[in-house]
């Protein structure tokens, strides 16, 4: 039954009146022209506009091999929610089996973001019975000049090319934003403390931006609302290059650090971002590979992707091992089993040390890591109470202000007991 449905399912024609049909080029062009006119009248600007993108990839990842069977159900719900959430002149078009482009009226990008978030939430709610674990779509927007880009457009091929061009231009602008401020970036290294035995086992590298007042802030203040992963990919390359300056052959082994360097999921998942980053990584001398650990991160910790093993295959043999950043949810840790990751770095930013249930929750997280064959790292640990709770719960490692402050240059692993006796 599933095979029949898969063969018969097509993205076109759309299932609602709000959908654009590339098979009808005359109507395709006429509806885009009406949208441009309405948007110009609304905004008062010829260059205004944002393209909405609804990404169904998280649902496909969650469904795994069942995707081909449930895809018609997913799309029926997606199109129904779009039809309900869009105005008469507004449009959507399926770009591929996991991507919808939304052309809607909005005076500013934020307004469209809010509307798309509501539509995405509606889709996720309707799919609760189909996608276990509550997997839902991701909505985002990118600036898109309706007046110029939609003019003289009569088909999907032209629209696809213009969207890709807009994405390339935006990616270049976001990457340039970081390069323009590269001299203000600072690489810092935070010690990672083992809890069973007081050892500094390594350092987590991270970047900060030095302001005119001398304060250090997160680099994302330069690009708080990215439409592509270009800014993060540029930051990943910059930080990897800084870390590699501390992994130079010829230094005594006792002086060499062990470094965990972050890379964003979007960097590894996007060929155009992954290639330059991997090219830099290959410059690391083979003898230094045991000293470099990769930490897969997101700006906000997410559940691991279904294709994590394939994603990590690109770095196999080029780093000592991989850590994956996850939210504080045992169900987000279980999928790491067999993925190639060796540890989970658990986000502690939402944990309340004063909550009596925190120790129990930490114990569940530590147990989930052990069940998946992983070491557990809790970050950031901001105070001594949470550090002690992590120790009591069986967490393996912690890093944060409660341990030791970050350094401008990392040092070698250190037994804190010996260091204490030496002083």
What are the residue ranges of the model-derived segments?
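Conserved long alpha-helical elements within nucleotide-processing catalytic cores of c-di-GMP signaling
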Residues: 5, 9-36, 43-50, 57-80, ...
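EAL-family c-di-GMP phosphodiesterase catalytic domain
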Residues: 2-8, 209, 295-302, 324-423
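Cyclic nucleotide signaling catalytic output domains
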Residues: 118, 122, 138-173, 221, ...
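EAL-type cyclic di-GMP phosphodiesterase domain
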Residues: 62-66, 212-238, 265-273, 284-320, ...
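Alpha-helical scaffold within the catalytic cores of cyclic-nucleotide enzymes
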Residues: 76-86, 111-132, 239-249
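C-di-GMP signaling machinery
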Residues: 1-32, 41-43, 143-188, 196, ...
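Bacterial c-di-GMP phosphodiesterase EAL domain
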Residues: 165-286
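Conserved helix-loop-beta segment at the catalytic/binding core of cyclic-nucleotide signaling proteins
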Residues: 49, 79-109, 132
């Amino acid at each position: 039954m599933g095979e029949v449905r898969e063969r018969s399912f097509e993205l076109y024609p759309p299932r609602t009146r709000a959908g654009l049909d590339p098979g009808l080029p005359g109507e395709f062009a006429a509806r885009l022209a009406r949208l441009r006119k309405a948007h110009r009248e609304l905004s008062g600007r010829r260059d205004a506009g944002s393209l909405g993108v609804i990404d169904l990839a998280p649902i496909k990842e969650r469904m795994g091999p069942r995707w081909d069977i449930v895809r018609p159900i997913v799309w029926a719900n997606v199109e129904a929610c779009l039809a309900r959430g869009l105005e008469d002149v507004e449009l959507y078009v399926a770009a591929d089996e996991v991507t919808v482009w939304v052309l809607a009226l909005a005076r500013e990008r934020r307004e469209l973001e809010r509307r798309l978030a509501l539509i995405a939430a509606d889709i996720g709610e309707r799919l609760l019975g189909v996608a276990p674990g509550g997997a839902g779509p991701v909505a985002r927007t990118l600036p898109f000049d309706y007046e110029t880009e939609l003019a003289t457009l009569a088909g999907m091929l032209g629209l696809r090319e213009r969207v890709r061009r807009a994405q390339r231009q935006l990616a270049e602008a976001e990457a340039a934003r970081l390069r323009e401020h590269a001299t203000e970036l600072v690489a810092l290294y935070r010690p990672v403390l083992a809890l069973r035995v007081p050892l500094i086992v390594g350092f987590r590298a991270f970047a900060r931006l030095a302001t005119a007042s001398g304060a250090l802030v997160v680099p994302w203040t330069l690009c708080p609302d990215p439409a592509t992963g270009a800014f993060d990919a540029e930051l990943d390359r910059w930080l990897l290059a800084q870390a590699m300056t501390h992994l130079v052959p010829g230094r005594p082994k006792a002086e060499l650090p062990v470094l965990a360097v972050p890379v964003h999921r979007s960097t590894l998942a996007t060929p155009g971002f992954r290639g330059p980053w991997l090219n830099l990584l290959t410059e690391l001398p083979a003898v230094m590979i045991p000293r470099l650990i990769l930490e897969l991160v997101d700006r906000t910790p997410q559940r691991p992707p279904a294709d994590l093993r394939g994603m990590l295959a690109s770095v196999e043999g080029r780093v000592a091992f991989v850590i994956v950043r996850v939210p504080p949810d045992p169900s987000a840790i279980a999928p790491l089993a067999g993925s190639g990751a060796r540890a989970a770095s658990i986000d502690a930013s939402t944990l309340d040390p004063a909550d009596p249930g925190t120790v129990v929750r930490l114990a569940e997280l530590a147990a989930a890591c052990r069940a998946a064959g992983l070491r557990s790292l809790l970050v950031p640990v901001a105070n001594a109470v949470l550090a002690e709770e992590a120790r009591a719960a069986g967490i393996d490692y912690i890093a944060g202000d409660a341990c030791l402050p970050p350094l401008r240059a990392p040092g070698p692993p250190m037994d804190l007991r010996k260091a204490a006796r030496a002083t």
